[in-house]
């Protein structure tokens, strides 16, 4: 059964991006310890955010190299962490979705576990995250909220 977690990640996009990089690192390390590398889709709000987090993943987390790529970069080898955004089709069976976009993708139930990043900025992003929480409830999923 799919699991959805809503995680508060600060009050700005910059803090949320750093939080997402740390979360990718934690999930990646857990899978390394199990000798089974899970596939992670890091879904951004748009192409600009995707490029920003692509650069940030070379720095965060410190002391850990995480092979990653933008999903539409055909010149890069396959990686266990792929960065996407709306309008870019994902075709792999990912284990985890880390969603920086306040709206859940229509295929969010295809992931073993979803991490919805919530920026507490009292803006439309936070309202859209609330709507995503309600969508989960409507779909019969009781999400976990971690503040």
Residue ranges of model-derived segments:
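Glycine-rich phosphate-binding "P-loop"
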Residues: 1-16
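Short amphipathic alpha-helical segment that frequently serves as the phosphate-/nucleotide-binding helix
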Residues: 17-22, 130
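Short hydrophobic beta-strand segments
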Residues: 4-8, 37-45, 97-99, 116-117
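Glycine-rich, aromatic-bearing surface loops/beta-hairpins
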Residues: 113-147
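A generic structural motif
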Residues: 64-85, 143-147
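Mid-chain, well-packed structural core segment of small domains
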Residues: 74-111
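Short, well-structured hydrophobic secondary-structure segments
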Residues: 20-75
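Short acidic, S/G/P-rich loop/turn micro-motifs used as interaction or catalytic elements
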Residues: 12-14, 48-51, 88-92, 103-109, ...
């Amino acid at each position: 059964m799919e699991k959805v977690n809503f995680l508060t990640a600060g009050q700005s996009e910059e803090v949320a991006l750093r939080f997402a990089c740390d979360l990718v690192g934690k999930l990646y390390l857990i899978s390394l310890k199990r000798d089974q590398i899970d596939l992670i889709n890091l879904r951004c709000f748009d192409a600009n955010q995707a490029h920003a987090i692509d650069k940030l993943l070379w720095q965060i987390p410190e002391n850990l190299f995480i092979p990653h790529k933008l999903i539409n970069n055909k010149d890069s080898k396959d990686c266990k962490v792929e960065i996407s955004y709306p309008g870019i089709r994902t075709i792999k069976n990912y284990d985890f979705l880390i969603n920086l976009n306040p709206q859940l993708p229509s295929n969010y139930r295809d992931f073993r576990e979803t991490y919805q990043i919530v920026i507490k900025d009292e803006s439309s992003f936070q309202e859209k995250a609330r709507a995503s929480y309600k969508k989960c409830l409507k779909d019969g999923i009781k999400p976990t909220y971690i503040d």
